Amino acid sequence: MDRRSFLKLLGASLGAAAASGSYYFYELDWIKVEQVILSSSKNNGSCRIVQLSDLHIHGLGFRERTALKILEKLNPDVLVITGDFIDEPDGLRPMLSFVKEACTDREAYGVLGNWDHWVEGKGGPSGDELAGMLCDHGVKMLINKAEPIRDGIVLIGVDDPHTRRDDVEEALRQVGSSEFKIMLAHSPEVVPNVEGWVDLLLAGHTHGGQVCLPIVGPLYVPSRLGKKYVSGLYRAMGTVVYVNRGLGWSFMPVRINCRPEITVIDLR
């Protein structure tokens, strides 16, 4: 389905929701915490990782403040943000304020998403410039590179797979075979290139479909893999894949049966 078809179907869905007095309009700010527990003999001790994705920040509103409060309560050892920090130049300043607060007193790592590159076409910073700003505000950006975070655990970040900027070969070249390998990628479109090569892949991009109707499911998933990896937990040739539904939105400010998400990954 192309964007025009999606918007037409979305309009019809919103009309039906409005006519029924549906609560779905409130889902934009109704954040859900999802938990994943993984065990591996490669880990030496425990580690709590919290994943944020697809912030698409336009301002510091109720949803962003709620996310910061949730993050504080979860108290992760490591925070990871899997791309799409902004989609409009006006979102840059509030996004950097959000990121600075989110990263205070904790390790934080990130990768770029498609909109982090595309925003340059709207008069915003380039992807490289944005990555530099994020580093200055507390996020260590892993652009096709790896970084050990704990004894036996290594993070591997790749640039955006949706726009084919990822260099999986270069990123994997930097790690050994014995570590527990966690890859950060904006889109699950990278799965065919990494399945069996990493232990855990954390991605976003899909927004979980954003608008999901009963029986029909997600109306539109912006991925070359279609609806194969929409949201939640999957396994691909020994690789655990987790796709986060994101905090923000695309096209229109609405979510239906698809609440925004913060993911907690407890490694034991």
What are these regions (language model features)?
Residues 1, 18-50, 58, 62, ...:
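C-terminal segment of N-terminal export signals and the immediately downstream linker at the start
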Residues 1-14:
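N-terminal secretory signal peptides and thylakoid transit peptides that target proteins
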Residues 37, 97-160, 164-167, 173-175:
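Extended active-site neighborhood of metal-dependent phosphoesterases/phosphodiesterases
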Residues 40-50, 139, 147-155, 235-240:
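Beta-strand-turn-beta hairpins that frame and shape the catalytic cleft
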Residues 52-130, 137:
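Membrane-embedded segments
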Residues 52-53, 79-83, 108-114, 142-143, ...:
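Active-site neighborhood of phospho(di)ester-bond hydrolases with catalytic His/Asp-centered motifs
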Residues 175-183:
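Short beta-strand/loop segments at the ligand-binding rim of alpha/beta enzyme cores
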Residues 188-263:
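Conserved beta-sheet core of the metallophosphoesterase superfamily
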